[in-house]
Amino acid sequence: MLTRFGAYLAATAAEGGRRRVVTRFAVTSITGLALAALGPTVASATVFSGSGCAQVNIIVARASTEAQGQGITGNLATQVQNASAQTVSTEAVVYPATLNNYASSESQGVTNAKQELASAVSSCPGQKQVLMGYSQGANVVLDVVTGNAEVRPSTVVGPAPAASLSHVAAIVGFGDPGNIVKQAWDLGTDTSTNGIFPRSSAQLHALTNFGAAASTRSWCDTGDPFCASGNNLNTHLTYLNRYQNAAATFVLGRIGG
């Protein structure tokens, strides 16, 4: 039986120029609990093994505490692979995904995601790129566009260059701690409460300039402890139950089927 609540996570958040301490429950394993009620399942996709470039590449950043790899968000990537008429490759962002030392972990995620994106663009300049992330992974993939000043790392990681971002066809996130409500790219039931690391107006401007209203979808539901500063951990762990099909449809539309 899984232990639902492990250690407390103490995270600092800034609002209105002052700092506050927000205590949130952490989990011993997001993977195990989320898999217990996983959303739409799909058959295993055929891994792209051609000698050239797939037409589409999906870069996935896993949730906090998941083992290295794509985590549960890999189910969404696989669904897109299976449904697309194009060749689709996938890869995982290599980063700690830890709750302790969150800012350092997330910074490494943004840095490595930027490097993976740049490498893919360099190797396959005609390839459409898709970024997907869950929880801390969602924080990572949106911060590829904005930089990660909101998590207050010791050294802020800046956004990816325009030369890389111009190849990104879609970004999908679930339970992003950097969430700001009522943005054009926001979906889900939360319309009143920001995440525990809300992005600044400058970061929102970066997303707007990137074209996030068309290219990005970020799901956050009321009660989520991380994207909506709530107290319902189960809400945070079960986005794929509710939104996996919608996310797949969105990505397929952005990449051209």
Describe each region flagged by the PLM:
Residues 1-45:
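Secretory targeting and sorting signals
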